[in-house]
Amino acid sequence: MTHKISVLHQDKKFDFSLRPKKLTEFCGQKQLKERLDLFLRAAVQRNEVPGHCLFYGPPGLGKTSLAHIMANTIGKGLVIASGPQLLKPSDLIGLLTGLQEGDIFFIDEIHRMGKAAEEYLYPAMEDFKVDITLDSGPGARSVRLDLAPFTLVGATTRAGMLSEPLRTRFAFTGRVDYYTDEDLVSILSRSSQLLAIEANQETLLEIARRARGTPRLANNLLRWVRDFAQMREGNCINSAVAEKALAMLLIDNLGLNEIDIKLLSVMIDFYQGGPVGMKTLAMAVGEDVRTLEDMYEPFLILKGLVQRTARGRVATPLAYEHLNRNPKDRWGEE
């Protein structure tokens, strides 16, 4: 079945317009949502500021959206900062003293905060107080300032890099996991309505199963399919058009992209399936180690294509099968 796309004249607020505003609009993550809903409603019922929250998991799964939802739920403001920009106490002072009572202070990539800034945050989290130094030299003096009670929400893709003193100061900790194809179809259905795109379930499923379990990527692919249909297919969209559009991005039916395929090919063709060190793989595909570990390896492991061992990464029989390679020599199959 073929559908028409209504061309939007303004799409500058694409990501913001698709962001869910309430937990009921947030698809997937059922257990996390249930816990967070209880946590927030209990605080509101007691007329208290909710405790500090930490969300962790791979990028693009909705950690920032949860911070927005929290602010909407309790009816307060949202102040956003990024960990790499918070290196020293002076980077935090203006943000902390500017908070209003009940505000959500969201720090993305909180694991990348500077150590000095992190330690400066401790009394702010525990007692809602900070010390500032006035003047300099022998006449310098420290003054303690009271802060308005606030909720710190941290987001990280690397929870293991958080120090224990910081991690234990969060009252609520939740992992955001990869989404099922069914959840992604629900997300895409909502997004297509907001973007005035008519697409059936078959088309949305074609996009969802190539989105690596990630809503952000799913929405980006939906926008790409819309653009492709607009420019190449007379604004008509169906599953065949979606398949052609996604093939142009070199994304296969499992959601693997060019880098994923290159990683598996290097492991199989040059290192007999492994084990191979991540530094070696990074040099072979022209990416840095951190990018591979954060953006590519988790999905390959999730799909059962790669195993992590003490000696390095190993391509599994599924990887051989997906790349149409013969696993006989490596795995002893007949």
From Swiss-Prot:
Top-level taxon: Bacteria
GO cellular component, one term: Holliday junction resolvase complex
Catalytic activity from the UniProt record: ATP + H2O = ADP + phosphate + H(+)
Major location category of this protein: cytoplasm
Binding residues for DNA: 308, 313
EC number: 3.6.4.-
Annotated localization: Cytoplasm
UniProtKB keywords: ATP-binding, Cytoplasm, DNA damage, DNA recombination, DNA repair, DNA-binding, Hydrolase, Nucleotide-binding
UniProt: ATP binding residues: 18-19, 60, 63-65, 126-128, 169, 179, 216
Chain spans, region Small ATPAse domain (RuvB-S): 180-250
Family matches, as SUPFAM superfamilies: P-loop containing nucleoside triphosphate hydrolases (SSF52540), Winged helix' DNA-binding domain (SSF46785)
One Pfam family it belongs to: RuvB_C
GO biological process: DNA recombination; DNA repair
Binding site for Mg(2+): 64
Keyword Cell division: no
Annotated coiled-coil segments of the chain: none
Record comment regarding domains: Has 3 domains, the large (RuvB-L) and small ATPase (RuvB-S) domains and the C-terminal head (RuvB-H) domain. The head domain binds DNA, while the ATPase domains jointly bind ATP, ADP or are empty depending on the state of the subunit in the translocation cycle. During a single DNA translocation step the structure of each domain remains the same, but their relative positions change.
Quaternary context: Homohexamer. Forms an RuvA(8)-RuvB(12)-Holliday junction (HJ) complex. HJ DNA is sandwiched between 2 RuvA tetramers; dsDNA enters through RuvA and exits via RuvB. An RuvB hexamer assembles on each DNA strand where it exits the tetramer. Each RuvB hexamer is contacted by two RuvA subunits (via domain III) on 2 adjacent RuvB subunits; this complex drives branch migration. In the full resolvosome a probable DNA-RuvA(4)-RuvB(12)-RuvC(2) complex forms which resolves the HJ.
Name recorded for this polypeptide: Holliday junction branch migration complex subunit RuvB
Native source species: Chlamydia trachomatis serovar D (strain ATCC VR-885 / DSM 19411 / UW-3/Cx)
